[in-house]
């Protein structure tokens, strides 16, 4: 019994020492609460479901038929400008969250029946990326996302339709960046 207590005590002391070292490491960084791991990953199987993939692309196609502004691209090279490959999933998480909250939820009564199936799927992806963070400064990413938001808002309802019409690009960009 004494040996078991000594073993448990040693384990607890080791855990305490490790915790103290971790706390010291954070203090040395100036107290920055940078995450240990980014959690910016999605399972490949999320993008291998033919039915929901088809519905996502059909929704995008239907909305793009209503999009009369062919001069503007929301999800393209400009969005990724200055963003490293390792930060792209975080960027796409930000775009996904904006698209859900500011575009899809308010427009949920349109483009049926696709919308009612695609929105919950994208919301699940957003939920799975909820712990996705990057270490350090994300100002360059926030700037790029803000430009996208400003473009959508400037275009009004036409911008929202354009964002829905680019759900296929959002889907592919999430897949490329997050798996």
UniProtKB/Swiss-Prot annotation:
Signal peptide location: 1-33
GO MF term list: cytokine activity; interleukin-22 receptor binding
Glycosylated residues (UniProt): 54, 68, 97
Keyword Disulfide bond: yes
Family annotation (InterPro entries): 4_helix_cytokine-like_core (IPR009079), IL-10_CS (IPR020423), IL-22 (IPR020453)
Cysteine pairings via disulfide bonds: 40-132, 89-178
Biological process, per Gene Ontology: acute-phase response; inflammatory response; negative regulation of inflammatory response; response to glucocorticoid
Location of the protein in the cell: Secreted
GO CC list: extracellular region; extracellular space
Predominant location: secreted
Swiss-Prot/TrEMBL keywords: Cytokine, Disulfide bond, Glycoprotein, Secreted, Signal
Family (UniProt): Belongs to the IL-10 family.
Function: Cytokine that plays a critical role in modulating tissue responses during inflammation. Plays an essential role in the regeneration of epithelial cells to maintain barrier function after injury and for the prevention of further tissue damage. Unlike most of the cytokines, has no effect on immune cells. Signals through a heterodimeric receptor composed of two subunits, the specific receptor IL22RA1 which is present on non-immune cells in many organs and the shared subunit IL10RB.
PANTHER family from the UniProt entry: INTERLEUKIN-22 (PTHR48488:SF1)
Protein name (Swiss-Prot/TrEMBL): Interleukin-22
Organism of provenance: Homo sapiens (Human)
Lineage: Eukaryota, Metazoa, Chordata, Craniata, Vertebrata
């Amino acid at each position: 019994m004494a040996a078991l207590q000594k073993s448990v005590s040693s384990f607890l002391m080791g855990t305490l020492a490790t915790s103290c070292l971790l706390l010291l490491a954070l203090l040395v960084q100036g107290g920055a609460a940078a995450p240990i791991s980014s959690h910016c990953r999605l399972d490949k199987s999320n993008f291998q479901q033919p039915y929901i993939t088809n519905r996502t692309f059909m929704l995008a196609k239907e909305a793009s038929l209503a999009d009369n502004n062919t001069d503007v691209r929301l999800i393209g090279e400009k969005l990724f400008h200055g963003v490293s490959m390792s930060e792209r999933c975080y960027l796409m998480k930000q775009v996904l969250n904006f698209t859900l909250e500011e575009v899809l939820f308010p427009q949920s009564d349109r483009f049926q029946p696709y919308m009612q199936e695609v929105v919950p799927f994208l919301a699940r992806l957003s939920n799975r990326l909820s712990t996705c963070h990057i270490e350090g400064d994300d100002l360059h990413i926030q700037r790029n996302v803000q430009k996208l938001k400003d473009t959508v808002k400037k275009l009004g309802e036409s911008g929202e339709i354009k964002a829905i019409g680019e759900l296929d690009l959002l889907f592919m960009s999430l897949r490329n960046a997050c798996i």
